Regions:
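Short acidic/histidine-rich active-site segments
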Residues: 47-55, 121-139
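Extended C-terminal subregions enriched in glycine
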Residues: 74-77, 92, 96-106, 135-138
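Histidine/acidic-residue-rich catalytic or RNA/ligand-binding cores of hydrolases
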Residues: 56-67, 81-86, 104-114, 133-146
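Acidic (Asp/Glu)-rich catalytic clusters
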Residues: 38-41, 83-89, 116-120
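Divalent metal-coordination and catalytic microenvironments
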Residues: 51, 71, 94, 128, ...
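Glycine-enriched alpha-helix->loop->beta-strand junction motifs that scaffold or abut catalytic
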Residues: 63-71, 88-94, 119-122
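Mid-to-C-terminal alpha-helical segments outside catalytic/metal-binding sites
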Residues: 78, 146, 152-190
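Divalent metal-binding pocket/active-site signature
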Residues: 1-80
């Protein structure tokens, strides 16, 4: 007899919500099944990139590491170095939104974005709730402009962030190859 902590989704009858890991597993499993079907029909596939590590338990970051292509936010990685190291080793994409975090969770000067970038984690800049947190008509340009000014990012730094953004995107390989070059998966310089 196998005991389970949680029942299958079809048998969930608790008035409480299931934990984040439960939701994430079922999203992962269903997206994987859907992607298999889409591949057989020569269609593009989907990636799982949840909101994770902005608030909540650091355990969410472990669940996302095991199931996801990348995550949005990840600021809690600053509190759990061993999980941060796993994200570094596997180069799991972190689409970070320091301006959004500044309004809700963490002031800009305490945001780990730049620290993660200097350590070599696969970070990019993104927008989160641009209608709520942006002051311009170009919220992504705003994120890049503020980060460039605050952290004194060089042109090379900005190019690396843009490259990371392309790598993290859900675009097919031929699109990435067009924007990043035929050797875009190759590490180092030529």
């Amino acid at each position: 007899i196998q005991s389970r902590k949680y029942p299958p989704a079809s048998e969930w009858n608790s008035i409480s919500n299931p934990p984040y890991s439960y939701y994430l597993y079922y999203l992962y499993a269903n997206i994987a099944s859907l992607n298999n079907l889409r591949l057989k029909n020569n269609m593009n596939t989907f990636v799982l990139r949840p909101h994770c590590g902005e608030a909540g338990d650091p355990e969410h970051l472990i669940s996302a590491f095991l199931t996801s292509y990348g995550i949005s936010h990840g600021i809690l990685l600053r509190k759990v170095p061993f999980i941060q190291y796993l994200y570094y080793l596997d180069q799991i994409g972190l689409a970070m939104s320091p301006l959004s975090n500044n309004a809700l969770f963490l002031t800009y000067d305490k945001n780990p974005f730049y620290n993660f970038f200097k350590k070599g984690l696969n970070v990019s800049l993104s927008t989160d709730d641009p209608l709520q947190f942006s002051y311009t008509k170009e919220p992504l340009i705003e994120e890049y402009s503020v980060a460039a000014q605050i952290y004194k990012l060089s042109g090379v730094d900005m190019c690396e962030l843009a490259r990371n953004s392309c790598l993290q995107s859900g675009w097919e390989a031929n699109i990435k190859k067009h924007w990043l070059g035929k050797n875009y998966m190759k590490g180092g310089v030529e």
